[in-house]
UniProtKB/Swiss-Prot annotation:
One of its GO terms (biological process) is DNA replication. The gene is yabA. It comes from Enterococcus faecalis (strain ATCC 700802 / V583). It is found in: Cytoplasm, Nucleoid. Coiled coil: none annotated. The keyword Cytoplasm applies. This is Replication initiation control protein YabA. HAMAP family: YabA. It comes from the Bacteria. Its main location: cytoplasm.
Amino acid sequence: MDKRSLYDGLNSLETDLDSSVTQLREIKAALHELVEKNTTLEIENQRLREHLQELNKLAGNTTETEKQELSKSRMNLEKLYEEGFHVCNILYGSRRENDEECAFCLDVIYGERTR
């Protein structure tokens, strides 16, 4: 390989890398915007839930769903489950394949406990 073709190949590689870095920066910026928006929406959603609960309490409506509200620990388990992880004692912490439902996990989160 002569010096000229080596130099041209190196310039081509540099151009490709610059292009890749530019694309990576654009993707990173888009991801940052999405994470920011997601966080904002989660906070707004939580505030709206709390406001709705306050309105229901003020109205004196004690519905069946309010009586069966999940505890904070079960809500944490539910969040982990929704993120794609097992929360059952059999496969705890491992990823759910293709986000398939797990009867054991659902029982841990929503099942009746009499202890």
